[in-house]
Amino acid sequence: MIKNREKDFKHNGVKVLRSSHRDIRRLKNIYKPALHGFRVWPSSWLLIDYFMRSRLKPNSRIVEVGCGWGIAGISCVKNFNSVVTCVDSDSAVFPYVNLHAKINDVTVTTVQSDFNDLCENNMKNMEIMIGSDICF
């Protein structure tokens, strides 16, 4: 992890803004995630490290459930050219996902849905389902 004084850091090539970064503070004044999507959880780093070591198949179609800020999915796009759909029950997390996608120069799709409401239609084109820190 490379840290600097600009309130951001990189993890395996993915730029992440800290909660104290002015853009995150601005979003927090407008969008207030109701569940646990108010920060990046450490389990995201573990999942990203696993993908980097296991060499995730390039161009995979991935759904990230309980995405929060979407950092694991963004890492898959950035490092493996994956096509990622970020799913969360709390739509207030999507501005954070979109900001991180923008600063990493990648594109992800966002879908507001509870995990229990996902159905075959949502998953028919997906190859891999990922999630970190989603069992609480």
Each language-model region and where it sits:
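S-adenosylmethionine-dependent methyltransferases
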Residues: 1-136
